[in-house]
């Protein structure tokens, strides 16, 4: 069965998997990729991309309201046709998943549709057939986490998968979880016309990001009409008289037409198959080294399945690294400077340490904090986007970047520059000396660096 034998087999066609398959093929490998659902994984089909189409629609509604201020229109009244919103989302998803399929075909990758799992150290079972490979890359991805409370299986409780297919707008939407997905979808459904409430068990939103960013985002969401409740735990979901209620530990009760459960994701280890006790795991995640090797040397694990950083852009690099090593290379993934973005309205983006982390490592006296508000940036003002700021955390002794945090309209695009500079080991002082285009949002980063150095031009003198 020579046609069933490959140099590299990849289980899972998400960001890590399809990149791994393409890279291995580029290096001359005979490659097979198994996908049980649709190419592109959670990111393209049920996560990153679909949510951004919803957010673009929400941004357009926001722009219509702002157009009154700019003298473009007189009547800002809007209504949302959810069927068309979903159809647009589906169109974008089809374009991208179709593009992934075309890329795989152009590189000669064999794609097998079906659920695959290891049946031996060099064997994969799929659809009643057995495939063999010299090296195997596991890219099983992750699944939405469910919290064990009474009523969690109520039909009105949705994950991000189901809510992105809603054809009718809920009047009252309660989001359990104030992380990335929860905040992003809150910023979509509120402009659509839903009354949105976010309930977060910890003391702040986006708990893994800089505390000041979290506080700024909370304040902004509340200002936009979103009800934000932190340090509140849901104890039960119950249907009463045809309505759905969430009961909270503090004794309060929330009514909802739909409930979005957004409390994180857990790894999907089903692809381990008969090797589930052979391949080393810890806390439900496959253990890998920096080259993505598992405890079985010719088997690799990339993306969410290893739990290192559950981000699509890290999955891309992990998949590429695993593929190069599967083809005989010696590559590692450096996760020192990975940007994180929340596509809320306004956006949030970070790279490096949070302020709390930097203080814990170096002490408050060793640091200088530079900040520059978009309200003092000409480009932001002319675009009607004055909200937010750039924050630079500097280790004073070496003028070294510890972290950069951005809250504002273009944060996700702007974070690439500080990420590149930190990877290149450029200093805050050197960045403050760089000429940035004027007028541009990116000037705010340069000015924040200048503020950290004590020489920001476009802020009043500190006394």
Task: Give the location of each predicted region.
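A structural signal for the hydrophobic beta-strands that form the central parallel beta-sheet
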Residues: 111, 138, 159, 228-230, ...
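N-terminal Rossmann-fold NAD(P) dinucleotide-binding loop
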Residues: 17, 182-183
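Glycine-rich flavin
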Residues: 2-6, 22-29, 34-169, 197, ...
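Short FAD-binding loop at a beta-strand-to-alpha-helix junction that anchors the flavin cofactor
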Residues: 290-309, 398
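Flexible, glycine-rich terminal cap/loop adjacent to redox cofactors
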Residues: 9-13, 25-37, 42, 49, ...
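Gly/Ala-rich phosphate-binding loop of Rossmann-like dinucleotide-binding domains
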Residues: 21, 25, 186, 190-191
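Glycine-/small-residue-rich beta->alpha transition segments that form the dinucleotide
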Residues: 133-135, 139-145, 256-269, 305
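Beta1/beta-strand and adjacent pyrophosphate-binding region of the FAD-binding site
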Residues: 2-14, 169-179
